[in-house]
Every structure is written in structure tokens, then in C-alpha cells.
């Protein structure tokens, strides 16, 4: 039993911290103290990462898998959770929503994400998905007195519950077709017996559930309204953590259905078409937005399309590209949303007009925001360029050159609305007073920007890690 705990130590640590936070909040009823324990908890999770073996192995009656893949994804989820925790407090206090349970729910969402990437059984994958989803529904409505927040939570819950039902039905069909819920055995069954219509129906429904979480077209309708209405700190976490967890699960599923990819070409073609529609719809819709949160919602849809390119290839290089992308996207998006959090006023929208002359109000924040915009647009030397290059080159290597070309065109379209933000900040005047942003949040965002630049100049620092993680994923 102790050996099993050590194999998935980050998950066990995060689960234990979640319970501890409940006790801390119940005893102190002080959100600041709960936040401090949450920060220490994430640091403990980081310290537990070396205990997880790099070689693939199984724990708890083969229900969970450990190894480099789990360690990498757990690192991404924990970094995202820690960054959100560091930049949340002042915003929540401003919105009269600084409740200790916010940090508890945030930690539980991270536990759900870790379960998804550690799942060796489809039942565990579903439990992780639901734990993450329910936590995100609550985070969307954490501003109890704000009608927009409540509306966002209800919309997310209703559509999310429907998607979860589809996901669960897919699991049932897969079990009916293969006789197992154990992911490696599904792969073995397909290799020996091939696949039938029942299995294809099941895997399609399962993928629809995951595509909903990444907000891919045509399962994206919820995201603009939910992202705009939710507290900005919750939006930042939804747009990054949920996507990273769902894409990690897609990689695990993709590895298990590898025999299909060799004989059933309609499968990668379908994913490629969804990726193409997602990229172009997200970018074109973002062009006409004047609200930054809504613009980033559509931008998030577009980035889901870029990452789906790597999934569509079905190759190790494609999956490694996705792993690199989810890490950089987590940094870029949380960094950009972090600046929105610092600028936002109580109960007000984040309009593009609010950023006119932003450089004269907060030069450092304007400079950092420009870095994030350039990186999200895929402009070198920032990490976003390398992230896109990796998935595009993987598509070319997989003889899907048309998909890579579509990605390049879609990325070129995105430059327009990202540059609109930069132009508004640096080339327009304002009479608004200077900002005095929270120093802790500013330092956190500056560190994130540094990492985005570092991984753009020295991508090998992270690429080797992603390749190692994939090499030691469950095969």
C-alpha cells in the first residue's frame, strides 16, 4: 500500500491538502489563512513530484498509472493552480467574494485534473472529469451576489452535465465492445480483434465529452458566455487547467486506440476537420470582440484547435507538441488574465477601451501584456511560437500538410486582434490615473512572462521534458 502511495505521491499529496484546507477553513474562517495554506500545499505538491517514478507503473489495483507522463501533467496543473492562487486575493476582496472555500475548490479541481492524467481505467477518468467539472461549476458562481456569475455557473453546469452524460455513455459502449475498462487492455483488444461499430460509437461519444471541455467547435457554445460572466480568476483557470486535463486524457486515449489510426483513416481526418473549424471559428469570432474576456474566450477556442492538430496526427511528435503547448498556454493565458485581474474594476466589464493609453498608466504591466499578446499570436522569440511550430511540424511529418497550412493561416488571422490590444496600450492616450497594482500579483506575472520568453529562446529546456514524459506514458 505504501508503495502505491509513493507511485502517485503528487496526487496523494494534493488530495490530503484538499482535506487539510477544509479543516483549516472550518477552524479559522479566515480566507487569508486558507490561502496561505493553499500556497504551502502547492509547494508540497512540487516537493512530492520527485517521488513519482519516471518509469511507467501502476498503482491501486491497476486503477492509476504513474510515470513521466503523470509527473509532467501534474506539474502543469499545480503550476496553474499556484499562479491562480497567488493572483486571486485582491480581486476577490474587491468583488466581496474572498471566501476560504474558493481555495479549497481550486485545489479539488487540481486533484480532479491529476486523476484524469493518472487514469489507467475509464472509471477513474470519469471520476476525475466530474471532480474537476463540479469544482469549476462552483468557481464560476463563486461571486454569489453577481447575476452574471450565477448565470455563468448555471449555463456551465447544465451543458457540462449533458456532456458528462455523453462521456459516460461512451464508456459504456466501449466496455460493451471490449469487455474491459482498463485502458491498456483496450489497446490489446483492438490489436488482437480489431474494432467494430459499437467501439467506434463509444470512442466518438467519449471524445465528444472531452471536446466539450476544450471548447472545440461545435461543442464550444458555452464558453464565451461562461468565460465572460465568471469571475476573471475562475475564467483564467477554466481556460487553462480544464483544457490541459482534457487534452492529456485525449493523449492517453489516443495511445490506446493507436491500432485504429493505422487502418481507419476517417478517425484522424475527423479530428483534423474539428481542429480546422475550431481554429478558424475562434479567430474570426475574436476579431469582432470589444470585451477582452470574451475575446480571450474565442482565442481560447482557437488555441484548442491548434492543440487538436497534435491529437489528429496520432504520432509521438504530435502528442509531445501538445504537451509542450499546454504548458506554454497555461503560462501565457494566466499571465494575460492576471493583468486583466489587476486592471478590472468592481462589477465592471473588461473592455478594450479600458486599455487605451495603458502604457502611461502602468508601463511594466503594458510591457508584460504585450509579451503575452505576441506569444499568443505565435510571434518569435516567445514560447507561443515554438508551441505552434511543434504541432504544425508534427502535422507535416504525419503527411497532413494541409492541416499545418490551415494552422498557419489561422494563426496569421489571430495576429490582428492581439495587435489591437498592443496598439491600444501603446499608441492611444488616456486621462485615467496611474495604477498601483498589487506587488505580489505583479511579480508573479513578471515571472510568468520571463518563463514564456525563456522557453521561446531555449525551447529544448522543455521539449526534452515533454519527450521524456511521452516516452514513459502508458503504452
UniProtKB/Swiss-Prot annotation:
Subcellular location, principal: membrane
Keyword Ribonucleoprotein listed: no
Pfam families linked to this entry: Proton_antipo_M
EC id: 7.1.1.-
BP term (GO), one: ATP synthesis coupled electron transport
Domain of life: Bacteria
UniProt membrane topology term: Multi-pass membrane protein
Molecular-function annotations in GO: NADH dehydrogenase (ubiquinone) activity; NADH:ubiquinone reductase (non-electrogenic) activity; quinone binding
Entry keywords, A to Z: Cell inner membrane, Cell membrane, Membrane, NAD, Quinone, Translocase, Transmembrane, Transmembrane helix, Transport
Transmembrane segments: 8-28, 36-56, 67-87, 100-120, 122-142, 157-177, 199-219, 244-264, 268-288, 295-315, 322-342, 366-386, 403-423, 443-463
Localization, UniProt: Cell inner membrane
An example Gene Ontology CC term for this record: plasma membrane
Catalytic activity, as annotated: a quinone + NADH + 5 H(+)(in) = a quinol + NAD(+) + 4 H(+)(out)
HAMAP family tied to this protein: NDH1_NuoN_1
Function, in words: NDH-1 shuttles electrons from NADH, via FMN and iron-sulfur (Fe-S) centers, to quinones in the respiratory chain. The immediate electron acceptor for the enzyme in this species is believed to be a menaquinone. Couples the redox reaction to proton translocation (for every two electrons transferred, four hydrogen ions are translocated across the cytoplasmic membrane), and thus conserves the redox energy in a proton gradient.
Family per record: Belongs to the complex I subunit 2 family.
Subunit architecture: NDH-1 is composed of 14 different subunits. Subunits NuoA, H, J, K, L, M, N constitute the membrane sector of the complex.
Protein name: NADH-quinone oxidoreductase subunit N 1
Organism: Chloroherpeton thalassium (strain ATCC 35110 / GB-78)
Amino acid at each position: 500500500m505504501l508503495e502505491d502511495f509513493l507511485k502517485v505521491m503528487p496526487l496523494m499529496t494534493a488530495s490530503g491538502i484538499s482535506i487539510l484546507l477544509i479543516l483549516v477553513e472550518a477552524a479559522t474562517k479566515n480566507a487569508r489563512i486558507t490561502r496561505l495554506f493553499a500556497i504551502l500545499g502547492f509547494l508540497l505538491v512540487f516537493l512530492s513530484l520527485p517521488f513519482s517514478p519516471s518509469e511507467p507503473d501502476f498503482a491501486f489495483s491497476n486503477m492509476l498509472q504513474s510515470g513521466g507522463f503523470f509527473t509532467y501533467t501534474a506539474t502543469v496543473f499545480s503550476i496553474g493552480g499556484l499562479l491562480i492562487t497567488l493572483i486571486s486575493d485582491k480581486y476577490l476582496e474587491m468583488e466581496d467574494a474572498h471566501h476560504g472555500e474558493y481555495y479549497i475548490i481550486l485545489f479539488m479541481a487540481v486533484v480532479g485534473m491529476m486523476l484524469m492524467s493518472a487514469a489507467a481505467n475509464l472509471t477513474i477518468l470519469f471520476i476525475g472529469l466530474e471532480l474537476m467539472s463540479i469544482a469549476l461549476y462552483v468557481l464560476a458562481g463563486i461571486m454569489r451576489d453577481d447575476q452574471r456569475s450565477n448565470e455563468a455557473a448555471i449555463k456551465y453546469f447544465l451543458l457540462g452535465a449533458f456532456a458528462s452524460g455523453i462521456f459516460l455513455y461512451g464508456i459504456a459502449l466501449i466496455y460493451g465492445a471490449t469487455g474491459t475498462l482498463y485502458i491498456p487492455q483496450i489497446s490489446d483488444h483492438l490489436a488482437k480483434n480489431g474494432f467494430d461499430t459499437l467501439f467506434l460509437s463509444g470512442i466518438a461519444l467519449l471524445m465528444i465529452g472531452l471536446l466539450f471541455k476544450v471548447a472545440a467547435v461545435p461543442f464550444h457554445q458555452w464558453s464565451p458566455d461562461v468565460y465572460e460572466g465568471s469571475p476573471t480568476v475562475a475564467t483564467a483557470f477554466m481556460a487553462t487547467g480544464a483544457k490541459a486535463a482534457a487534452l492529456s486524457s485525449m493523449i492517453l486515449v489516443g495511445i490506446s486506440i493507436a491500432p485504429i489510426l493505422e487502418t481507419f483513416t476517417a478517425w484522424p481526418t475527423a479530428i483534423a476537420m474539428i481542429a480546422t473549424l475550431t481554429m478558424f471559428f475562434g479567430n474570426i469570432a475574436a476579431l469582432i470582440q470589444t470585451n477582452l474576456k470574451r475575446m480571450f474566450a474565442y482565442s481560447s477556442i482557437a488555441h484548442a484547435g491548434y492543440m487538436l492538430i497534435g491529437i489528429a496526427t496520432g504520432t509521438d511528435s504530435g502528442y509531445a507538441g501538445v504537451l509542450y503547448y499546454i504548458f506554454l498556454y497555461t503560462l501565457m493565458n494566466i499571465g494575460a488574465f492576471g493583468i486583466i485581474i489587476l486592471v478590472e474594476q468592481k462589477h465592471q466589464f473588461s473592455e478594450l477601451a479600458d486599455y487605451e493609453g495603458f502604457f502611461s498608466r502602468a508601463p511594466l504591466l503594458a510591457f508584460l501584456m504585450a509579451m503575452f499578446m505576441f506569444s499568443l499570436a505565435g510571434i518569435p522569440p516567445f514560447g507561443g511560437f515554438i508551441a505552434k511550430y511543434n504541432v504544425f511540424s508534427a502535422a507535416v511529418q504525419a503527411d497532413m500538410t494541409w492541416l499545418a497550412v490551415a494552422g498557419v493561416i489561422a494563426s496569421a488571422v489571430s495576429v490582428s486582434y492581439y495587435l489591437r490590444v498592443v496598439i491600444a496600450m501603446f499608441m492611444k492616450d488616456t486621462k485615467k490615473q496611474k495604477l498601483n497594482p498589487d506587488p505580489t500579483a505583479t511579480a508573479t506575472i513578471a515571472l510568468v512572462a520571463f518563463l514564456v520568453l525563456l522557453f521561446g529562446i531555449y525551447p529544448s529546456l522543455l521539449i526534452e521534458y515533454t519527450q521524456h514524459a511521452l516516452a514513459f506514458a502508458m503504452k
